[in-house]
């Protein structure tokens, strides 16, 4: 299993092509290639070569399977949000806070369609700890917030494409997102 995405940091005008694969002990390994922001909605020949290289070197796929997989990749969704990151240097933990989460469906050429979902009045908090619970985790638990599984990609695909199964994300969608969800036409010219 692997994931390929581009990630753009609007404030710094940085863009990366990222390939996420499974490492030892179920750990996720993320490799990045500096990418042109203008290419964020497509896979360039250099980008395809990077994907193939990462899939082969991580032993995720054999060479031919990696080439076939990279050749079949096409844009499907644009996910945007505003992120704030806090670092707790004493224990090496970080916490990210994502607001204004928006998913927009793309066609196979990377062009926005008329399908867009905005999740309002919710903050997606992710804590990233080296080993044990951080002070942020304990504060969230004390306030009654329990961990919830969330893949922004899988959840976005499920809410944009009603025909896809929501199995794993059904509870998150119905209990956490539906009350704050606004289906809107996509922005034009963006």
Labelled PLM ranges:
Residues 1-190:
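Phosphate-end processing signature that detects enzymes handling 5′-triphosphorylated RNA
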């Amino acid at each position: 299993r692997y994931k390929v995405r581009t990630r753009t940091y609007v404030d710094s005008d940085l863009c990366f092509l990222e390939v996420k694969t499974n490492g030892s002990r179920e750990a996720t390994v993320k490799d990045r290639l500096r990418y042109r922001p203008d290419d964020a909605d497509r896979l360039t020949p250099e980008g395809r070569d990077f994907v193939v290289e990462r899939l082969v070197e991580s032993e995720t796929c054999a060479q031919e399977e990696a080439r076939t997989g990279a050749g079949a990749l096409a844009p499907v969704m644009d996910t945007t949000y505003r992120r704030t990151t806090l670092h707790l240097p004493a224990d090496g933990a970080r916490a990210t806070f994502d607001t204004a989460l928006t998913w927009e469906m793309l066609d196979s050429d990377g062009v926005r369609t008329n399908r867009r979902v905005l999740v309002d009045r919710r903050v997606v908090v992710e804590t990233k700890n080296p080993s044990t619970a951080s002070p942020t985790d304990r504060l969230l638990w004390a306030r009654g917030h329990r961990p919830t599984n969330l893949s922004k990609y899988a959840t976005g695909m499920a809410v944009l494409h009603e025909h896809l199964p929501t199995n794993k994300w059904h509870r998150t969608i119905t209990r956490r997102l539906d009350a704050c969800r606004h289906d809107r036409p996509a922005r034009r010219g963006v």
